[in-house]
Design a protein with these regions (language model features):
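Short secondary-structure boundary/capping segments
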Residues: 1, 10, 25-26, 95-98
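Conserved Nudix-box catalytic region and its N-terminal flanking loop in Nudix hydrolases
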Residues: 17-57
Length: 130
């Protein structure tokens, strides 16, 4: 069974809203929303991968030394096992824009519980919003 390692972020703004990003149309689970982030590359650790992904996807920089409140999740998909660290991000530099063309959406905790999310992200919501 293939194992995929990734980092994701629960990005919260000053109003407590959480940022979601749409799936690319060419990806599986189209029409779903997910937390920003992505797969690890070239022996990166989870924090470094998150820094790279947020810069690539959203044009923002985070201080990886200030990352806290993180949790590890596993989710079994049909063809692979996802191993994911999820970090809470409340501070960043730069203006959030979609550099890769996906839609961005800020949602309240209530809206997040109703959003059509990737299966692995649903576990994350249940944990962080308990």
């Amino acid at each position: 069974m293939k194992v995929v390692f990734c980092s994701s972020a629960i990005i919260k703004n000053k109003n407590g809203e959480i940022l979601l990003i749409s799936r690319k149309q060419k990806d599986s689970f189209t029409n779903c929303w997910e937390f920003p982030g992505g797969k690890l590359k070239n022996n990166e650790n989870f924090a470094v991968a998150l820094f790279r992904e947020l810069k690539e996807e959203l044009n923002i920089k985070i201080d990886i030394n200030k990352l806290s409140n993180y949790e590890f999740f596993k989710h079994q998909y049909r063809s692979f096992l996802l191993m994911m660290y999820v970090f809470e991000v409340t501070e960043w530099t730069g203006k959030i824009i979609s550099k890769e063309g996906e839609l961005l959406r800020w949602v309240s905790a209530k809206e997040l519980k109703k959003a059509k999310l990737l299966p692995a992200n649903t576990k994350v919501v249940n944990y962080f919003l308990k």
